[in-house]
């Protein structure tokens, strides 16, 4: 996962893309304007052409992305945070990191032990199948603890 500044940069880039796409699509779909007879009476309840639908769609996308940008900006650390607060936050993060590393090491250790048991069981199964195919009497090996 990216850090907050990268997320903010991506959101701003997305917002710029949406502005460019909105302008391009609206220019492409806009009907030619007639300057001699300008009509302003438009039915507001129902879009009369796809251009209005595109305008509503892009307005919603741009508004949502702008809200995302605001949320990301608000989540950035403030300038008022002192060095002591930052140091305390870093110590807390370091402790959490060490705890997570210890849990990870334990899980890896248990996974390795389980893998070893599975490999031993597979080797026993393979030996039993070989003995069965060759017609040799099967010898049971005592289970390892």
UniProtKB/Swiss-Prot annotation:
Q: Fetch the InterPro entries from UniProt.
A: Med7/Med21-like, Mediator_Med21
List locations, semicolon-separated.
Nucleus
GO CC terms in record: mediator complex
From which residue to which does any coiled coil extend? 79-112
UniProt keyword annotations, A-Z: Activator, Coiled coil, Nucleus, Transcription, Transcription regulation
UniProt superkingdom? Eukaryota
- Any Pfam family hit: Med21
Entry keyword Transcription regulation: yes
Under the GO molecular function aspect, what terms does this record hold? Answer: transcription coregulator activity
Primary location class: nucleus
Per the UniProt entry, what are the Gene Ontology biological process annotations, in alphabetical order?
regulation of transcription by RNA polymerase II
Q: Is Transcription regulation tagged as a keyword?
A: yes
Against Gene3D superfamilies, the record matches this protein to: Mediator complex, subunit Med21
SUPFAM superfamilies per UniProt? Mediator hinge subcomplex-like
Q: How does it assemble?
A: Component of the Mediator complex.
Protein family: Belongs to the Mediator complex subunit 21 family.
Q: What does this protein do?
A: Component of the Mediator complex, a coactivator involved in the regulated transcription of nearly all RNA polymerase II-dependent genes. Mediator functions as a bridge to convey information from gene-specific regulatory proteins to the basal RNA polymerase II transcription machinery. Mediator is recruited to promoters by direct interactions with regulatory proteins and serves as a scaffold for the assembly of a functional preinitiation complex with RNA polymerase II and the general transcription factors.
Name assigned to this protein: Mediator of RNA polymerase II transcription subunit 21
**Naturally occurring in which organism (per UniProt):** Danio rerio (Zebrafish)
């Amino acid at each position: 996962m990216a850090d907050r500044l990268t997320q903010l940069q991506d959101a701003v880039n997305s917002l710029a893309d949406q502005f460019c796409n909105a302008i391009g699509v609206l220019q492409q779909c806009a009907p030619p304007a007639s300057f001699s007879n300008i009509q302003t009476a438009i039915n507001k309840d129902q879009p009369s052409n796809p251009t209005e639908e595109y305008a509503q769609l892009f307005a919603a996308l741009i508004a949502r992305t702008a809200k995302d940008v605001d949320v990301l900006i608000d989540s950035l650390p403030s300038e008022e945070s002192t060095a002591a607060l930052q140091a305390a936050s870093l110590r807390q993060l370091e402790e959490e990191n060490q705890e997570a590393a210890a849990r990870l090491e334990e899980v890896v250790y248990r996974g390795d032990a389980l893998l070893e048991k599975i490999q031993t069981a597979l080797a026993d199964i393979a030996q039993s199948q070989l003995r069965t195919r060759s017609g040799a009497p099967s010898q049971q090996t005592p289970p390892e603890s």
